[in-house]
Amino acid sequence: MQSKGTIISIQFLLRFLLLWVLIGKSHTEEDIIITTKNGKVRGMNLPVLDGTVTAFLGIPYAQPPLGRLRFKKPQFLTKWSDIWNATKHANSCYQNADQSFPGFPGSEMWNPNTDLSEDCLYLNVWSPTPKPKNATVMIWIYGGGFQTGTSSLPVYDGKFLARVERVIVVSMNYRVGALGFLALPGNPEIPGNMGLFDQQLALQWVQKNIAAFGGNPKSVTLFGESAGAGSVSLHLLSPRSQPLFTRAILQSGSSNAPWAVMSLDEAKNRTLTLAKFIGCSKENDTEIIKCLRNKDPQEILLNELLVVPSDTLLSVNFGPVVDGDFLTDMPDTLLQLGQFKKTQILVGVNKDEGTAFLVYGAPGFSKDNDSIITRKEFQEGLKIYFPGVSEFGREAILFYYVDLLDDQRAEKYREALDDVLGDYNIICPALEFTTKFSELGNNAFFYYFEHRSSQLPWPEWMGVMHGYEIEFVFGLPLERRVNYTRAEEILSRSIMNYWANFAKYGNPNGTQNNSTRWPAFRSTDQKYLTLNAESPKVYTKLRAQQCRFWTLFFPKVLEMTGNIDEAEREWRAGFYRWNNYMMDWKNQFNDYTSKKESCAGL
């Protein structure tokens, strides 16, 4: 039986513990209520590794673009009086989900995981604990071809990066597809680039408010992947964006890529085509806009897919345009003139950038087999991916990427089409962007990511795919419940450190002397660092010959064959057919010779 003294001691201990819990609870709640320029927001503490991170999810940064605000630039937010509960992700912006492979995690992981709504202009903040003072800020911009994407995806969770590197991570939703990029250039009611103006307003929000979260508005680095990287590089070119950030990281995308910016005429034609499809063909722009604003967003989504021919792949239906406001000229021109923010950039690409696009309609390709394609299927693939290119242009690609190599392996056409798409759309534009940037004396760093994740659900032949460095940038391999390897955790920690060092100091090496120094990229030697699970190495002039083909030779071929008459066209077509016959004969003869030699040895 317990003594009276023991009971009193236990009661005292319980009261003390209860008091400690209450004090701790109130202290924690007080810590996670932040006062912004628009009002107070409540966040939450998340356990991360051996500590915590404070997360604020779903903070509004603009008025909902509803009704008369549809298709317009985002409007500044008014103040609220209550405490905004920022403890769960907000709506995703309206978009078409990828339904090509239902239930397959490789494609489903990129689909929106919150409700779709036009009321979607919200951002997220992850801050290390205890609350920092003047911490570097890293703002993530998601990709998705300007057609899809949301900041709430698990692969974009900022908690590990905030915890390990003690930076503040911010991400925002922005409008995509027709609702974000429909354009009647020159008309303020539907100016185009609304999604980019959304991003820009989020950057302004960070400048005004991030100090309240412990961040330094004078140390802000933008980073993004694919169309997100294209967006980041457009902010480098946009005079109104340039004062709103410090540095930039571009992962597998740049604004000078062929898909990143469309002409004014093309943008207007697509807007009028969409209007026609949904019954909004009117006599003037005012009536068209009024009609489009009254349409259900789901109807707009369904019809925006029809604007580009179905046999065209890798097409951005609605994307950035030269509006004279956000973007004053084509990116190539601005780069040539040196009209971009003078700062430091970190740029890079993945080893197999093209494969992710091949399983979405290229002849002979499938995620369920090895996709060993024929010469004819390769040629059909070129027609789909280069719809406006002449036969002679496509034959030049075939000759350079296949015939010139005299490769006898069965995989040669599959690998060649991967290289063609990756070089043309991602790798060579990124290298060209970095080269132009560095020529004016700006510090640039370039990486080549070559590790295939052990958790990748796509088939082995697809290699180190477009988009699959992101999980390492955000530290997902540090999550013990997911079965990444120890080497992958080390790689992820290394990449997070490189990215954070660059954000803090403008140099991925930081202030420490590591075993392998990441050298600056100069236009003369073009040094770059490989990122893998073994050991990083420094090389020079990545894909230099292939990029010369796209920047120098290929445009000349198109120029020289653009105006040939029909007789010469027929003669050349006949010559190429003869050349194909000769290639087949050569292959059969080599096969015959090989068999003859093997028989002679019997």
From Swiss-Prot:
Name the residues that bind substrate: G144, G145
Q: What is the lineage of its organism?
A: Eukaryota, Metazoa, Chordata, Craniata, Vertebrata
Which coarse location class applies to the principal site listed for this UniProt protein?
Answer: secreted
Phosphoserine PTM positions: S226
Q: Tell me what gene encodes this.
A: BCHE
Under the heading InterPro entries, the entry gives:
AB_hydrolase_fold, AChE-related_enzymes, AChE_tetra, CarbesteraseB, Carboxylesterase_B_AS, Carboxylesterase_B_CS, Cholinesterase
Identify the CDD domains for this entry: Esterase_lipase
In this protein, the active site sits at S226, E353, H466
Entry protein name:
Cholinesterase
Q: Which SUPFAM superfamilies match?
A: alpha/beta-Hydrolases
